[in-house]
Curated annotation (Swiss-Prot):
This is Protein disulfide-isomerase C17H9.14c. The record marks 116 as: Lowers pKa of C-terminal Cys of first active site. One of its GO terms (molecular function) is protein-disulfide reductase activity. Keywords: Disulfide bond, Isomerase, Redox-active center, Repeat, Signal. Residues 20-130, 134-250 form the Thioredoxin domain. Belongs to the protein disulfide isomerase family. It comes from Schizosaccharomyces pombe (strain 972 / ATCC 24843). Transmembrane segments: none annotated. It holds the Pfam family Thioredoxin. Participates in the folding of proteins containing disulfide bonds, may be involved in glycosylation, prolyl hydroxylation and triglyceride transfer. The active site is at residues 51, 54.
Amino acid sequence: MRLPLLSFVIFALFALVFASGVVELQSLNELENTIRASKKGALIEFYATWCGHCKSLAPVYEELGALFEDHNDVLIGKIDADTHSDVADKYHITGFPTLIWFPPDGSEPVQYSNARDVDSLTQFVSEKTGIKKRKIVLPSNVVELDSLNFDKVVMDDKKDVLVEFYADWCGYCKRLAPTYETLGKVFKNEPNVEIVKINADVFADIGRLHEVASFPTIKFFPKDDKDKPELYEGDRSLESLIEYINKKSGTQRSPDGTLLSTAGRIPTFDEFAAEFLDMSNAAKEVVLEKVKQLALEDSSRWTKYYKKVFEKILNDENWVHKEAKRLSKLLRQKSIALASADDFKTRLNILNSFLPGNH
């Protein structure tokens, strides 16, 4: 017996979207079809890519999705309602993030208005579906310390270390938790930066030693001056914390964990690179000699790469365009390893210093 076409499409879509914990939906039509396919209901996050609160919610929502991943009849989904304005219009989305529960019987959707932590969201979905779940502990990108290992980790003179001193009962700490977890994820590929935390209520000796008077307290321990940690007094948003660490550690991370477009760039070489493609071959030869001389004074990896690019362009002007296109394609692959992504992004940044409009 053949299934009606619509039923087949919905079935196929249903099987596809539940392949991962949180389903990223791409259109109003896909959203509605997927909701209809959810036999026990659907929780949808309407978000915007620029929204700081959405970024803070992301790790919590991913954990929620993982928790219900093995229940194919429940949908934990999300859609960019800023890009898909027809979605925002239909569901009257006026702020981000907005979480809405869609009952399986097609009755009136319910906007979620409770706390945005894993426990509260899990309880909400469990009440709506009848599926009882316990919170699962996902691998963390933030190192949890105690009295025994605090000095070994924090006082490592090869690493800049950001420490959150927290207490379990502290409401502000709970609100900071998803942001701090994301912060750990952003910097997990930085070999000289560590994002850590310690329960200074339980390990009160550490709290007293470091003059922790309230929770959460965040301190930065620089690798070159461990005896003078700096109290972080800025905004506790993800963007502000990233900006702070980038400034203190010389890192160049963006909120999604990728490198900024300035990573790897060297101003001295950029000055030559900006005009190199338009120069005559004779002028290029002169510049290349200057670059080689500078490279003798600085043998760092990216200095060598600049030199290589100058040499490649001298032999083939089209090489820089082809190589930039190749690296861009590699960076779009979702399965790319973090270390490879950093390497490709830095190379692409340097190549862009040669290309018109990217200086």
